[in-house]
Amino acid sequence: MDQTPRRMLGQPLSSPATQPKKRSTSVMSFFSKVSWNLRLQKQEPLKNVFFILAETARDPSVKKRHMVMRGLGTMACETPDKVRKYKKIILDLLVHGLYDPVSSEVIHESMKTLTIILGKMQGKALGSFFIDITLQTRTLLDDENDSLRYSAFVLFGQLADLAGRKWKSFFTRQVKQTQDSLLTHLQDRNPQVAKACKTTFRACSPYLRQSKDYSFQNEEDQRNPKLCRQLVSERGQETFFQSLRSRCRCKAEGGRHTRELPP
């Protein structure tokens, strides 16, 4: 992740002393309008709501950008049929939020909403968005923020299930480049992140078996072609993960993560 300073999730966004109070009011007014439009779509076409969201998603205000991502998540839950109809517009907005250069809150909300929407779309008609989402999600697996890491592992595991035949080769390469992160965060000091990583590890195991490089050990260690066969075996899973704990202890100690996820 870039070195741009970020606020901790859950902390209120600070605002300059010169910032007018009117801005806060305008944010609330905007999303009251969006919420109202969701309930009264017959009075105002939903496409107008998307026009407002698209414009606001590029607003200089972090609060507005963050609330756009949250609003898209609400729309995905309340109007799933409309989400399918406008999926390209929605995905474009969410990918834009996923690459937000300033705010971890915007990125986090984008990932959470993408998880909802991809589940409803079942991976259909993702097109090149699949590449954009995968590349950015992979970079967030090692982020210092617990919530970002957690959501990134959840989303990456979902992408593993949705890759299909079209993106099989591409995703196999991405998983291979993610091996160190997967191994390290099996030992993540945040138990929720470690659990999400373990689930994603299993989802990625078919792609690991297709790779010629099966190793999850240090570079100087011997390659182990039995790794994935052991991983996907029901009997061997727990033994496998227990053995990994001792192997990657040194790596984990280099980047201990102790913060808890916000409720």
Curated annotation (Swiss-Prot):
Covalent S-S links between cysteines: none
Location of this chain's protein in the cell: Nucleus, Nucleolus
Gene3D superfamilies: Leucine-rich Repeat Variant
HEAT repeats: 128-163
Keyword annotations of the record: Nucleus
InterPro entries per the UniProt record, alphabetical: ARM-like, ARM-type_fold, HEAT_Maestro, Maestro_heat-like_prot
Name of the protein in question: Protein maestro
Record organism: Bos taurus (Bovine)
Gene from which this protein is expressed: MRO
